From Swiss-Prot:
<comment type="subunit">
    <text>Homodimer.</text>
</comment>
<comment type="similarity">
    <text>Belongs to the DTD family.</text>
</comment>
<keyword id="KW-0694">RNA-binding</keyword>
<dbReference type="GO" id="GO:0043908">
    <property type="term" value="F:Ser(Gly)-tRNA(Ala) hydrolase activity"/>
</dbReference>
<keyword id="KW-0378">Hydrolase</keyword>
<dbReference type="GO" id="GO:0019478">
    <property type="term" value="P:D-amino acid catabolic process"/>
</dbReference>
<protein>
    <recommendedName>
        <fullName>D-aminoacyl-tRNA deacylase</fullName>
        <ecNumber>3.1.1.96</ecNumber>
    </recommendedName>
</protein>
<dbReference type="GO" id="GO:0005737">
    <property type="term" value="C:cytoplasm"/>
</dbReference>
<keyword id="KW-0820">tRNA-binding</keyword>
<dbReference type="Pfam" id="PF02580">
    <property type="entry name" value="Tyr_Deacylase"/>
</dbReference>
<feature type="short sequence motif" description="Gly-cisPro motif, important for rejection of L-amino acids">
    <location>
        <begin position="138"/>
        <end position="139"/>
    </location>
</feature>
<dbReference type="GO" id="GO:0051500">
    <property type="term" value="F:D-tyrosyl-tRNA(Tyr) deacylase activity"/>
</dbReference>
<keyword id="KW-0963">Cytoplasm</keyword>
<comment type="function">
    <text>An aminoacyl-tRNA editing enzyme that deacylates mischarged D-aminoacyl-tRNAs. Also deacylates mischarged glycyl-tRNA(Ala), protecting cells against glycine mischarging by AlaRS. Acts via tRNA-based rather than protein-based catalysis; rejects L-amino acids rather than detecting D-amino acids in the active site. By recycling D-aminoacyl-tRNA to D-amino acids and free tRNA molecules, this enzyme counteracts the toxicity associated with the formation of D-aminoacyl-tRNA entities in vivo and helps enforce protein L-homochirality.</text>
</comment>
<dbReference type="InterPro" id="IPR003732">
    <property type="entry name" value="Daa-tRNA_deacyls_DTD"/>
</dbReference>
<dbReference type="InterPro" id="IPR023509">
    <property type="entry name" value="DTD-like_sf"/>
</dbReference>
<dbReference type="GO" id="GO:0106026">
    <property type="term" value="F:Gly-tRNA(Ala) deacylase activity"/>
</dbReference>
Length: 150
C-alpha cells in the first residue's frame, strides 16, 4: 500500500462539481492499493501517519503529529500510485489491486484512520473521476510505502 501524504492548509475533493469531502488544516492522503496488501500494511501506515511529526511546534520545528496538532485528514483513493512507466509511453496499471479488492482495503484504511484519530475521515468517491483541490503547506510532501518502510 502506498500513500502520498501532503500537509495542507485546506483540501477538498469534488465529483460532478459537488464537494464530497473537505478539510481545513491537516493531511491530504492519496492512497494506492496493490493485491498483496493486508491488515498489517494498513496498521503500519495508519500508525506511521498519525504519529509523523510534520506540524510545527511553538519554535517552528516540525515536532507535532496530526493527533497533537488537531489536524484533519482527507483520504482519496488513487490507483495510479502503482503505475509502471517502464515500457513505452502509456502507463500500465497491472500492479494496482483490482477495483473490488482496492475498495475493500481502502475502506479498511479509512476506518482504521478514523478510529486512530477518533473522528471521521472524509474521502472522495471510489472509482469516480475526481477533482482534488489543495493548498500545500510548506510544502511538505512524503511518500510512504508499506513494502519499503524507511
Amino acid at each position: 500500500m502506498r500513500v502520498l501524504l501532503q500537509r495542507v492548509g485546506q483540501a477538498s475533493v469534488e465529483v460532478d462539481r459537488q464537494v464530497v469531502g473537505e478539510i481545513g488544516r491537516g493531511l491530504l492522503l492519496l492512497v494506492g492499493v496493490e493485491p498483496e496488501d493486508s491488515a498489517a500494511d494498513i496498521d503500519w501506515l495508519v500508525r506511521k501517519i498519525v504519529n509523523l511529526r510534520v506540524f510545527s511546534d511553538a519554535e517552528g520545528r516540525m515536532n507535532r503529529s496530526v493527533l497533537e496538532d488537531g489536524g484533519e485528514v482527507l483520504a482519496v483513493s488513487q490507483f495510479t500510485l502503482f503505475a509502471s512507466c517502464r515500457k513505452g509511453n502509456r502507463p500500465s496499471w497491472s500492479r494496482a489491486a483490482p477495483p473490488e479488492l482496492a475498495r475493500c482495503r481502502f475502506d479498511q484504511f479509512v476506518a482504521a484512520m478514523s478510529e486512530a484519530l477518533q473522528r471521521p475521515v472524509p474521502t472522495g468517491v471510489f472509482g469516480a473521476d475526481m477533482q482534488v483541490a489543495l493548498v500545500n503547506d510548506g510544502p511538505v510532501t512524503l511518500w510512504l510505502d508499506s513494502r519499503q518502510p524507511e
